[in-house]
Design a protein with these regions (language model features):
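Flexible hinge/switch segments at interdomain interfaces of large molecular machines
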Residues: 35-45, 81-87, 122-146, 174-180, ...
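Transmembrane helices with small-residue packing motifs
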Residues: 12, 19-55, 113-122, 167, ...
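Transmembrane alpha-helices and their membrane-interface boundaries in multi-pass membrane transporters
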Residues: 393-407, 430-449, 456-496, 600, ...
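Extracytoplasmic/periplasmic membrane-proximal domains and adjacent transmembrane bundles
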Residues: 6, 37, 45-48, 90, ...
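Hydrophobic transmembrane alpha-helices and their membrane-interface caps
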Residues: 25-31, 340-348, 353-409, 467, ...
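Solvent-exposed, membrane-proximal periplasmic/extracellular interface segments of envelope transport
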Residues: 59-131, 190-211, 232, 567-644, ...
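Signature of alpha-helical transmembrane segments and their immediate interfacial
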Residues: 1-34, 427-429, 496-545, 602, ...
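Helix-loop junctions and hydrophobic alpha-helical segments within the transmembrane domains
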Residues: 317, 324, 328, 404, ...
Length: 1022
């Protein structure tokens, strides 16, 4: 007995099984975590090292190169990118997709640890980290301000930050605008030398005086007590009274230096609406839950209000949980609207309330089933997985439509009883229903097995589509026949075609008769349309990597010139601030200022509250911002913590750094006049101005000292000495580093630098100018390499012409300069990702088409028939191309997903036609009658399934809600591709069938004739 038969005969059992699955599905749905995008495994590991005060050249040779060379034994490396800059080294290791990144982190840590002793002693230990798509992404930004900033700083550092760091799912808590406290022993070089002290000697005296020592144990009978010498000091006046010398006269620290409680030189300041603020940025871990994390974080902040300094105010400037809830809500809303529209279409065709409700029940049940499957494999509720469900809103009813339509045929044409019709009608089409669903499912199977970003990003969507189609099959061959046997009757099934459909059918039959009579012209027209569309259409379209979304926020980022101090950075920031503040749509803005860059994040309100898009607002701001000098700007439609990413990154590579720099400057100059590019920048920054201290080695040798003594002395005066081994001032709530250095005004005076005293012996000092010369020079700001080859990167944002056009322009300018063979180019950033991902999806599409062919060949037991059916796929591309042109939709990664989806959907109409034609011919009808009758009788179900899919995706294509830009391109692709393909398939496929059938018949006849002639010759010869 078939599954349909069991379901019909045991309705209670079937109902309870369905209810159980629905219950499990609902339970799974409400327990799944919500995220904006899936958890993506990006095989990237970073190695970061800081070396305070070191210039880029020294960082490159003494840190970066040694770390890179240590990785030679690590396997599966795709590329290594390095950046050596003032005071820091960054090594980014990209691995092949599919590797265990955690294992690679362990390997790298092991290899780097082997060369740690070879690194400069004052360089910090390299930090090895795995990069996750989710880790490091900001989930919330909270701005605090208070009149008592010192107390606020202490509260955030000592109380709030530890509480936030203890939350489940937290990745990192970053604080900006709160420079660390320092107890500075501010010295005067001449005064120290007067007391026969060098800064190193003074600091060693201080450190010895405040050190806690373990003394041992004291046993008193039955107890052992640990003895500790407590040298730590916890008051500033205690430091001032530290005894320096008691030879003759008592000398205390306050006699030779000023003890000042201050802060370190600020490197990052925060402002909220122009007011000095402390900014707290939260990011989640790779397995964290944004919604749960933000909720817990905001609850902690609310609970800690009583502990905040008086007058403290705070404002939540970014809450990504709102974006997640809003985006998911809009996708869900689009799905519901699509369901309503699909139901209306069904009713318009069926004209039966019972039948419409019966088919419409299949969709929500199948979707709820799907949640159970997705939950079992750990999928989150995100934009991608929900999109996979939403695009099936119209398609998931197709299986039920086929089943009900065949039950209808058994009741009305074969006069079968309802129970018998439900069972037999379902059994007849079970195989075709499964085959039809499989064509949709198999197109997404390749994505699951092709390593790369495409698999990581679209894995959840693939599973959602596969599982939802699987659930739809189960519902169609169990629940639908069971309900049909109980609720349908002969009266409810008898309907007549409406007047509109009769006109459509009559018009279609005229067209198909003409096409059948003019097969050559019909095929020529279709081929011409295809090639015309392929060659002309793409030239009218723009290319992007990912769809750009209007989330009501944007950021303005400015890269400052090398050597910019914090005060100048603040002045420049105020100019940007005035531009953003005076933009009419600005509701709130947050500003982060450092010596290297400025970031202003602005909130312009929800999409539906304004007429202008966020991109129009950004363009207005960009035009005004061009007038501000001393910085390069870049705008993004997302909040930023100070780092900017561009649409296009053009990498010029070569073994000679000076050569590629000169070449890069020429290309940059040419591109500056191109209107299609905005926010143009490069790594060709002017070098950092250096004061190079050149030691006279003969002189210092004559004094009996070495260069290290001079370097250490200057390091203490300027930087504060050895920060890895500092003394501390311990209070009740914090530990404050104690440093020896010059006062700030003297640290910025070159004359004082030249006159610093260097101790060369007991009571013997010389001026720096006596043993060294100081000269100005321009040092390299950054040294960029990719796989050990010097690289100059030119980056830009799209000014409205599309990424492909910008790429072509960059290549054109590159070639126009006749580059030598030693210089080459490549792509980075989003451009590289776009090329790789598009290539992966194209490869996946090729495999998908082969799988469809294999499936159809198995179904029809023919190698020729699937070729005819697959002919409907190119027809879909005609609709896709002109649909994108009409709607002004760029070609992006979501459009490619729509094309892959189409490959599995559009063939279903051709399958229906060919299958029915074959059925008619097996019943003894001639070819022409079989074709014409099949076209007439299959028109209604083909149009019905097409229109339910098209109207089911219409809300997504309209793109009205938050985040709708993300899936709009895919919906447009499916709607136009399926619509055009259906119209053209109804005409071309019957013609192709006839042409191929005539050809194969003639070929078989010819082979038989040749065979018969051979046999006759053999008989005659015999």
């Amino acid at each position: 007995m078939s599954l349909a038969g069991i379901s019909i005969r045991r309705p209670v059992a079937t109902t309870m099984v369905m209810v159980s699955f629905i219950f499990i599905g609902l339970l799974a749905m409400f327990s799944m975590k919500k995220e904006l995008i899936p958890n993506i495994n990006i095989p990237v590991v970073t190695i970061s090292t800081t070396w305070n005060g070191a210039v880029a050249e020294d960082v490159e040779t003494q840190v970066t190169k040694k770390i890179k060379d240590s990785l030679s034994n690590v396997e599966a490396i795709d590329k290594i990118q390095t950046v050596s800059s003032y005071g820091s080294s960054s090594v980014v290791v990209n691995f092949d997709f599919g590797v265990d990144t955690n294992d690679k982190v362990t390997q790298i840590q092991r290899e780097v640890s082997k060369i740690t002793n070879d690194l400069p002693k004052d360089a910090n230990t390299p930090i090895v980290r795995k990069v996750d798509a989710a880790t490091g992404s900001m989930t919330a930004i909270i701005a605090f301000n208070s009149d008592n900033k010192t107390a606020l700083n202490t509260f955030i550092k000592e109380k709030l930050k530890p509480r936030l760091e203890s939350l489940a799912g937290i990745g990192e808590v970053t604080i900006a605008g709160n420079p660390e406290k320092q107890l500075q022993i501010q010295v005067d070089s001449d005064k120290l030398s007067a007391y026969n002290l060098s800064p190193m000697e003074l600091y060693n005296i201080i450190r010895t005086a405040v050190t806690t020592y373990p003394i041992g144990k004291l046993s008193t009978g039955d107890k052992d007590m640990i003895i500790r010498f407590m040298g730590e000091l916890d008051y500033i006046d205690q430091y001032e009274n530290i005894l320096i010398s008691s030879d003759g006269n008592t000398l205390r620290l306050k006699d030779v230096a000023n003890v000042v409680l201050t802060t370190e030189d600020p490197d990052r300041l925060g402002y909220l609406k122009g007011k000095d603020s402390i900014i707290v940025l939260l990011s989640k871990s790779s397995d964290g839950d944004t919604i749960g994390l933000n909720s817990a974080a905001f609850k902690v902040i609310e609970e800690m209000k009583p502990y905040m300094p008086a007058g403290t105010e705070y404002s939540i400037e970014l809450d990504n949980s709102e974006n997640i809830n809003s985006s998911i809500s809009n996708v869900s809303s689009s799905a519901i609207q699509g369901l309503v529209l699909a139901t209306i279409i069904l009713f318009a065709f069926l004209k039966s309330f019972r039948t419409t409700v019966l088919i419409s029940l299949a969709l929500p049940v199948a979707i709820i089933f799907t949640f159970a499957f997705l939950s079992m494999r750990g999928t989150t509720l995100n934009l991608i997985s929900l999109m996979g469900l939403s695009i099936g809103v119209g398609m998931l009813t197709d299986n039920s439509v086929v089943v009900v339509d065949n039950i209808y045929r058994h009741i009305t044409e074969l006069n079968s009883p309802v129970l018998e019709a439900a069972e037999n009608g379902t059994e007849e089409v079970t195989f075709s229903v499964i085959a039809s669903a499989l064509t949709t499912m198999v197109v997404f199977i390749p994505i699951l097995f092709i390593p790369g970003m495409a698999r990581e990003f679209f894995r959840d969507m693939s599973y959602a589509i596969i599982f939802s189609n699987l659930a739809a099959i189960i519902v169609a061959i169990t629940m639908i026949p069971m309900l049909a046997s109980r609720f349908l009757n002969r009266k409810s099934m008898k309907t007549e075609d409406g007047r509109l459909f009769k006109k459509v059918k009559a018009r279609y039959l005229k067209i198909i008769h003409w096409a059948y009579a003019h097969k050559g012209k019909t095929v020529f027209i279709m081929v011409f349309l295809f090639f015309f569309s392929i060659f002309i259409g793409p030239k009218l379209l723009k290319f992007e990597f990912m769809p750009k979304q209007d989330e009501g926020k944007y950021s303005l980022m400015a890269e400052l010139q090398n050597g910019t101090d914090i005060e100048k950075a603040k002045r420049i920031a105020r100019e940007w601030e005035n531009i953003v503040k005076n933009e009419p749509h600005t509701k709130s803005y947050l500003m982060l200022v450092s010596t290297s860059n400025i970031s202003i994040n602005a909130d312009v309100g929800k999409k539906g509250t304004r007429k202008e898009s966020v991109f129009d607002i950004m363009n207005d701001v960009r035009k005004q911002a061009k007038n501000v000098l001393d910085a390069r700007i870049s705008l993004s439609n997302q909040f930023s913590g100070g780092r900017s990413t561009k649409d296009v990154e053009f990498l010029i590579q070569g073994m000679n750094q000076d050569e590629i720099k000169q070449f890069g400057k020429q290309i940059l100059k040419k591109l500056q006049n191109y209107d299609g590019i905005v926010d143009l920048s490069s790594t060709l920054d002017p070098g950092i101005i250096e004061l190079r201290i050149n030691i006279d080695r003969d002189k210092i040798t004559s004094y009996g000292i070495n260069p290290t003594v001079v370097a250490q002395t200057l390091s203490y005066y300027m930087l504060g000495g050895d920060k890895a081994n500092t003394a501390t001032l311990k209070t009740d709530s914090e530990e404050i580093d104690v440093l020896i250095r010059l006062p700030k005004d003297k640290r910025n005076d070159i004359n004082i630098l030249q006159s610093l005293n260097i101790k060369v012996g007991d009571n013997k000092f010389v001026k720096l100018s006596d043993v060294a010369t100081i000269q100005y020079a321009e040092g390299t700001s950054k040294i960029n390499k990719k796989n050990g080859i010097y690289t100059v990167t030119i980056s830009a944002n799209d000014g409205g012409v599309g990424l492909r056009t910008i790429q072509q322009k960059m290549i054109e300018e590159f070639n126009s300069l006749n580059p030598p063979s030693s210089i080459s180019y490549s792509w980075g950033g989003q451009t590289e990702n776009m090329q790789k991902t598009m290539s992966q999806l194209t490869f996946a599409l090729s495999i998908s088409i082969f799988l469809i062919y294999a499936l159809l060949a198995s179904q029809f037991e023919s190698f020729i028939m699937p070729i005819i059916i697959i002919g409907s796929i190119p027809l879909a591309l005609i609709g896709v191309i002109w649909g994108l042109v009409v709607t002004r939709q760029s070609i992006d990664i979501m459009v490619m997903i729509g094309v892959i989806l189409l490959a599995g959907v559009v063939v279903n109409n051709a399958i229906v036609l060919i299958d029915f034609i074959k059925t008619m011919r097996t019943r003894g009808h001639d070819k022409e009658y079989s074709i014409m009758y099949s076209c007439e009788t299959r028109l209604r179900p083909i149009l019905m399934t097409t229109m339910t899919t098209v109207f089911g995706m219409m809300p997504m294509a309209l793109g009205l809600g938050e985040g709708s830009e993300f899936y709009r391109g895919m919906a447009i692709t499916v709607i136009f591709g399926l619509s055009f393909s259906t119209i053209l398939t109804l005409v071309l496929i019957p013609v192709l069938y006839s042409v191929v059938d005539d050809f194969t018949t003639k070929l078989i006849t010819k082979i038989k004739n040749i065979s018969n002639k051979s046999k006759k010759k053999g008989v005659n010869n015999g």
